[in-house]
Amino acid sequence: MPKVEVKNGDLDAALKSFKRITSETEKAYKKHEFYLRPGLRKKEKEKAAAKKRNKYNKRRSFYY
């Protein structure tokens, strides 16, 4: 169970760090939820890279 210490009554910062920690745990769980063959894992990785690249190019072209 993730633990976060609240310092100086700053609940917002503690809540933010708690959400970040739990989201990382959730991502790791979903990643290892079932077995992916190496070829499919590679395709997913390439698909994610293309999505990231398209997002970057879209933001970059907005300013021109």
UniProtKB/Swiss-Prot annotation:
A Gene Ontology term for the protein's cellular component: ribosome
Record keywords, A-Z: Ribonucleoprotein, Ribosomal protein
The protein, known as: Small ribosomal subunit protein bS21
Family statement drawn from the similarity comment of this UniProt entry: Belongs to the bacterial ribosomal protein bS21 family.
An annotated Gene Ontology molecular function: structural constituent of ribosome
Domain of life: Bacteria
Annotated region described as Disordered, given as residue ranges: 42-64
Species this protein is from: Malacoplasma penetrans (strain HF-2)
Biased composition (Basic residues): 50-64
BP GO terms, sorted: translation
